């Protein structure tokens, strides 16, 4: 079975949104990475995400599929 990889661009404004995003990511049993300026951060790491420049768009790569997490991605997606 081929693992599906999808990506999405999100914007997280502040600590509360980061916490909500990480909580949703942590419920997934597959890897989720955030790419930003050639840096790769684990989407399940709240400190890792908070160390990034949250004024920038962040590219999220999901190595699996979760309808619940997709809703979170849609909520924070950059149009």
What are the residue ranges of the model-derived segments?
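C-terminal structural segments of small proteins and small subunits
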Residues: 50-79
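Conserved short beta-strand edge segments in small beta-sheet-based binding/regulatory domains
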Residues: 32-37, 75-79
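Well-ordered beta-strand positions in beta-sheet-rich domains
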Residues: 7-9, 40
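Amphipathic, hydrophobic secondary-structure cores in small proteins
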Residues: 33-55
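Hydrophobic side chains in well-ordered alpha-helices
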Residues: 20-24, 69-72
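Short, surface-exposed ligand-recognition loops at beta-strand->loop->(often short) alpha-helix junctions
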Residues: 11-16
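Short, Lys/Arg-enriched N-terminal segments with co-localized hydrophobic residues
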Residues: 1-4
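N-terminal intrinsically disordered, cationic/polar leader segments
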Residues: 8, 23-28, 61
């Amino acid at each position: 079975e081929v693992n599906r990889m999808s990506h999405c661009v999100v914007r997280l404004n502040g600590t509360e949104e980061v916490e909500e995003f990480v909580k949703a990511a942590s419920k997934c049993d597959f890897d989720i990475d955030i790419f930003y300026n050639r840096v790769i951060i684990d989407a399940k790491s709240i400190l890792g995400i908070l160390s990034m420049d949250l004024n920038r768009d962040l590219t999220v790569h999901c190595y699996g599929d979760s309808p619940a997490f997709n809703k979170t991605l849609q909520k924070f997606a950059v149009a």
